[in-house]
């Protein structure tokens, strides 16, 4: 990844404002998509639970996707990005 910021003692400085704004926008889209996907997965898991399909491949795959998504969101939160 090409950095668009430089870290200094007082914080961060941008090297290319337009490129940084573009990347920030894409990052925000990613965060929105992750949060939306987590909600959709939770709804789908609940539907499968109600059908008694908690041992199905679909349920296990969705549960794994939810865990990965939650890990990513937790990591973003730990950096105060959400």
Regions found by a protein language model. Name each.
Residues 2-82:
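Extended, charge-rich alpha-helical interface modules
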